[in-house]
Amino acid sequence: GLTILYEDRDIIVIDKSAGLLTVKAAYEKEKTAHHILTNYIRKGSFKSTKQLFAVHRLDRDTSGVLVFAKSAEAKENLKLQWKNVRKKYVAVVHGILTEKSGTITSYLAENDDYEVFSVKDSRKGELAKTRYQVLKEAKRFSLLEIELLTGKKNQIRVHFSEKGHPLVGDDKYGKKGEPKSRLA
């Protein structure tokens, strides 16, 4: 699940495990970091009106640090500062990249099946930029440091899949038939 790393009167910072959703989805309403933490701040009382706000999200299969605000005001203050936060990830991808560093830029759109993909027309998608640096290479895999310059749904997964180097363990955008593993 999750581990609380820091808490004060305005925020809760957690380490989210892979496999846990950040917030509810149509198919899952209770096994989410938001639901677990809301119960925590309400101390199990259904009568409590305390609220919690996700400042950002991580994909279900991604582990990492998440920030939740304990008030709408705290959330808005954090959102205003969020563009100044550097978002870095480490991921293992299939193959050896010819360019050892670079920036992937595309416009991302989503279809009715919730699949995200790049489009050429800027009016049909949202700008997404991903900077990367190869840290290490093995025979069939590369370890990357990835920095999100924008933060769109499934951005890292889509960018590297479309580049021909899907994330190891990604059952949505990755290699079909690969044994399940975890993402970044």
PLM regions and their residue ranges:
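Thr-Gly-centered strand-to-loop micro-motif
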Residues: V23-K24, S118-V119, L144, V168-G169
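RNA pseudouridine synthases
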Residues: G1-F117, R123-K129, E137
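Pseudouridine synthase
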Residues: K29-L37, S71-A72, E110, L127, ...
